[in-house]
């Protein structure tokens, strides 16, 4: 067989293959290719938009850290501050077994007394002069208002070495039973939180206390929801 005949046979075979490709299956295959192309194009466009507008991709490290710190319990955040600065820090919680009084615990999980802070006679003792953040939270609960108004008080007081008298630094009054009319409604439980906080210039040896007029209404259902603390700034 001559070379020209061989080339001619190859050309005829190619023409036959092209003719078969343009047969009944040709339009179907073209349609599939077109659909596949558009799907890939749409997917690429969607991915670009998501990356461009920040819907997906690496998260901001600072924002993630702030969110994580916001979820930390109070004592963990206080402990973090203490570790970084080595300044006086105190965070104590109430004794749930103390009947009829608000008694702060010195040795318990989630209690922190560091860098000179101490709890003496149910009072936090300041070890050095400076600015301090003072805070406290009480949570009250009751089964009913007993058909009469109820005024709950929460105070944080200071006794300084320079003058041996108690002075209120922070105070608040709340009533869970306002406008109660005798026999006007059925008994229903109530809950009332009171949070206090402020920054003060304190002196070495100052004694701080947190009290309430109705300790019998304190809610100890959850550990750590009644607390008292001081942080040096």
From Swiss-Prot:
PTM section of the record: The soluble form derives from the membrane form by proteolytic processing. The membrane-bound form is further proteolytically processed by SPPL2A or SPPL2B through regulated intramembrane proteolysis producing TNF intracellular domains (ICD1 and ICD2) released in the cytosol and TNF C-domain 1 and C-domain 2 secreted into the extracellular space.
THD domain location: 88-233
Keywords: Cell membrane, Cytokine, Disulfide bond, Lipoprotein, Membrane, Myristate, Phosphoprotein, Secreted, Signal-anchor, Transmembrane, Transmembrane helix
Subcellular location: Cell membrane
Site feature location: Cleavage: 39-40, 49-52, 77-78
Transmembrane segments: 36-56
Lipid attachment points (N6-myristoyl lysine): 20
Modified sites of kind Phosphoserine: 2
Record topological domains on the Extracellular side: 57-233
Primary role: Cytokine that binds to TNFRSF1A/TNFR1 and TNFRSF1B/TNFBR. It is mainly secreted by macrophages and can induce cell death of certain tumor cell lines. It is potent pyrogen causing fever by direct action or by stimulation of interleukin-1 secretion and is implicated in the induction of cachexia, Under certain conditions it can stimulate cell proliferation and induce cell differentiation. Induces insulin resistance in adipocytes via inhibition of insulin-induced IRS1 tyrosine phosphorylation and insulin-induced glucose uptake.
Similarity remark: Belongs to the tumor necrosis factor family.
Name of this chain's protein: Tumor necrosis factor
Source organism: Notamacropus eugenii
Phylogenetic placement of the source organism: Eukaryota, Metazoa, Chordata, Craniata, Vertebrata
